[in-house]
């Protein structure tokens, strides 16, 4: 076959054009050392802070320390397969996790991979785990209630959608129980829940998942689990991964609730990572940015306005506000709320629910100390009927605690003091509540109404809870319309109040409890 010179050049041109070669420029480095999930890498000159790094055998890491001649990175997952001399590549991406409604009902790890043995999760989107919180202009004030179903909280420390309310207390005081009851209480209310378990035993996490399944709560809940056996890096990042999953719903005009159980263990994990990366330690050996660790996480919980949602969804969702409510949990040591991490988180959040060991051991469960528990913004979000009826509860309790201390020394008490003490005992008894039994609004309203109007004053303290239960059973049987009106309107009109008063009086005369 004869080709003249001009044809040769044309043929070469067409061949070169048809190659379609693409260049993938990526910096490559070498592992210098690996210790406890921390690796030092030489040669990654243009790596970004927080960038994902690719190790051999499909292992990924996260660049955290950018030094002059090396990079300090944490390995996500099993680090035993990484050794000195391995080649590491930059990916040009920061850490992302899968997001979307497909995650509901599943248990995933920090990276969003399923660990519940129910097969793969077919999510359509991913999102970065470190995001900037919505600005002041994008936010709406907290004005919608988030019912926990717990009498003591909904009446005295109300929580609103978009609020950050800290649950703080020693170990074994019922912190997780409050959080789980709150999740169960969201059934049928259109709230997607995210439960982030950090540094807990796998058996404990399994118990929580089982309880949520038993009460039909897993269908609207995502569980992000970083157990005690996971690496410190996975434990420290789990909260951010869970927050991103919750933000997916907030940004689309829906309501979400996220529980971090608990941020003390996350701070421990971050301290461990920081010390291994040779960052200078500060107070209690925590690194200097441990406040920022929690503030940038908790500031992402917010109620965003209609304009933010409309802009985010490119006009697909209009006229809807979205919210992400956060309930971080902090474990104290011997009731010391003035330690470093507790004071940090108290200053970041919009209030705290303080659980006390002494109350818990005395049988007051949930063991909420009403004196120092506070909700800074939830009052504006409280339902009208509960707000109307719960005004006297906190005062009664505060006076009771004060008088009870004096009554130990005084033998003869005047009638007014004795009445206040008796009322206080009944309030304390009424606020007790079994686990996994969150109340509806009408049930809370009836309980508050009976104690406020003195209907419990002549009921024996030991019979207060059985009186409450029997009364509600009778109301369900004979006054279903009244219950429905209170539940629908969240108000107690004069006519409804008169009907409720007559029903309670009738029950006291003829009811058995």
From Swiss-Prot:
Entry's EC annotation: 7.1.2.2
Superkingdom as given in the UniProt entry: Bacteria
Chief location bin: membrane
Gene3D superfamilies: 2.40.30.20, ATP synthase alpha/beta chain, C-terminal domain, P-loop containing nucleotide triphosphate hydrolases
Similarity comment: Belongs to the ATPase alpha/beta chains family.
UniProt subunit comment: F-type ATPases have 2 components, CF(1) - the catalytic core - and CF(0) - the membrane proton channel. CF(1) has five subunits: alpha(3), beta(3), gamma(1), delta(1), epsilon(1). CF(0) has three main subunits: a(1), b(2) and c(9-12). The alpha and beta chains form an alternating ring which encloses part of the gamma chain. CF(1) is attached to CF(0) by a central stalk formed by the gamma and epsilon chains, while a peripheral stalk is formed by the delta and b chains.
Protein name as annotated: ATP synthase subunit alpha
Organism, as annotated: Bordetella avium (strain 197N)
